[in-house]
């Protein structure tokens, strides 16, 4: 959530920043905000005037009563002022949630270093890496026609028909060797993030309440992207209030909420958390996109990284976390590139985002495998997540999140990049300890 003080002081500047996101929509209802703010100021001024007048009258009434002089007229005025003040205060209490509702629908402001653009065409490649050539090198082509992960995975136990039978489209079943590979990848990622990069491993609920999703920005704007959960015996639709429950779209949601309504000591920062969880997304608006294979699923696994940091250190943390995701790709010998997202392609809560895109030979292109974002104080303001600074004052933290990595897409990349002409898969050296020393996967 944006700082309302910023909007009050320089609304035009904030609107100009929002317009850089280049989406054809009013991010902020300026007329509604301006009208509510004008009414709020008027009510607040009048309430203060009433209180001052009541205080003055009360000072007069006491001495007059002591002298036995009549105070009926003054008392009548005090009572009238009290009634008016209560009415004004009641309206003020109504305006605050109305302003809050407006602000909850407003995205974060892009950082000055973010390129302005309408969509992914405006993104800027920062660097690329390949196992054959290192930094700056393109992915080396395979010496034979590449098969895609669907054909490679089928003999290894990748079963889309069973997934459709059990749950519908965009679900997958994995059995045997490929299920083992999937598990090994998740364990490998967790070990890198905990043992090498210092994240604390966490186990979190896969179902969270609406307040938790509001804190990280998924609600109220993106409810259509979520799966709502209904308790057994519950009639009708889930309640539209904070008692409603949803499947998590990412473990960023519960992990970041660890600091909701908390004031942490400055010495505790940075707080670095990671978790391996399934993620559930309705993929609303994705009809017809990536219908073949595992690239876009309703349920997928991810190892998430979250950092809660001092505001002065969040951009250093962004670069660090991007490197933490890159380390997984390099260890798995997967070619990739790092892309700085433009204003029109960034997520709702982000002020700056790097995407890591892995090379998929069968598609002859790079595909997103991780997004790493700095949200500055945007989530922290919604969460009321603060730290006590050196002056003893409470200050909002900055929050960052990133995939380290999406397990299913990493599985796809391993299959396609490490395939042999006969369809067998070379197991990357870093993964072999997680597969009992196995060097080759065959159907």
Swiss-Prot record:
Subcellular location per the Swiss-Prot or TrEMBL entry: Cytoplasm
EC number: 6.1.1.11
UniProt-annotated binding residues for L-serine: 250-252, 304, 403
Principal location: cytoplasm
Pathway(s): Aminoacyl-tRNA biosynthesis; selenocysteinyl-tRNA(Sec) biosynthesis; L-seryl-tRNA(Sec) from L-serine and tRNA(Sec): step 1/1
GO MF: ATP binding; serine-tRNA ligase activity
Database matches in Gene3D superfamilies: Bira Bifunctional Protein, Domain 2, Serine-tRNA synthetase, tRNA binding domain
A single GO BP: seryl-tRNA aminoacylation
Alphabetical keyword list: Aminoacyl-tRNA synthetase, ATP-binding, Cytoplasm, Ligase, Nucleotide-binding, Protein biosynthesis
GO CC annotations, alphabetized: cytoplasm
Presence of the UniProt keyword Signal in the record: no
PROSITE patterns, per database record: AA_TRNA_LIGASE_II
Catalytic activity: tRNA(Ser) + L-serine + ATP = L-seryl-tRNA(Ser) + AMP + diphosphate + H(+); tRNA(Sec) + L-serine + ATP = L-seryl-tRNA(Sec) + AMP + diphosphate + H(+)
Binding site for ATP: 281-283, 368-371
Pfam families, alphabetized: Seryl_tRNA_N, tRNA-synt_2b
Top-level lineage group: Bacteria
Family matches, as PANTHER family: SERINE--TRNA LIGASE, SERYL-TRNA SYNTHETASE
Family: Belongs to the class-II aminoacyl-tRNA synthetase family. Type-1 seryl-tRNA synthetase subfamily.
Subunit structure: Homodimer. The tRNA molecule binds across the dimer.
Biological role stated in the UniProt entry: Catalyzes the attachment of serine to tRNA(Ser). Is also able to aminoacylate tRNA(Sec) with serine, to form the misacylated tRNA L-seryl-tRNA(Sec), which will be further converted into selenocysteinyl-tRNA(Sec).
Name of the protein described by the UniProt record: Serine--tRNA ligase
Organism: Variovorax paradoxus (strain S110)
